[in-house]
Amino acid sequence: MTWPLIKNSITWKDRFLLSKFIMTSDKFTQGSKVRAFEKEWSDWSNTKYSVFVNSGSSANLLLTSAVTELYKIEKNAKILTSVSTWATTVSPIIQLGYTPVFCDTDLGNFCFDLSHLKKLSEQYKEEIKIIFVPHLLGLKAPVSVY
């Protein structure tokens, strides 16, 4: 059995609206539509601010940078993440000077294997400063159990 990595979820209506926007707008980034989207997203997610970026890769880099700066995480600190993830989850960890620690995957939900997570937490005790929980392939990780 094979599963497609992703299916095209963009409808013809979406394509039409996007092409109309491109043809009639002189600003594609940081314009009024982006600010309106950020505001609407903040309202929906019940957060004070939102920042729209071009990709999940950029979002991961921005998130890792912001969290490590906010909590004053020193370089070379260990950040735990799943072994089953995209390179764009791991790349910001390395790019920003941190050390990734990989947790095995529970094949039932493609999230952390809880027994391995416990083993790693005992092995590294206070060394792991951040747990980066990827929600792989649209599957929501059960973060409340971590």
Q: Residues of each region from the PLM?
A:
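Conserved PLP-binding active-site segment in aminotransferase class I/II-type PLP enzymes
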Residues: M1-E74
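Pocket-edge positions in alpha/beta enzyme catalytic cores
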Residues: K7, S25-T29, F102-D104, N109, ...
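Generic structural signal for small/hydrophobic residues in well-ordered secondary structure
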Residues: L18-S19, W41, A59, I79, ...
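A short beta-strand submotif of the Rossmann-like class I SAM-dependent methyltransferase core
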Residues: F52-S55, T81, I130-V133
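Glycine-rich phosphate-binding loop at the start of an alpha helix
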Residues: V53, S57, A87, C111, ...
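Conserved PLP-anchoring active-site segment centered on the Schiff-base-forming lysine
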Residues: T64-Q123
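Active-site phosphate-binding strand-loop segment of PLP-dependent enzymes
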Residues: G108-Y146
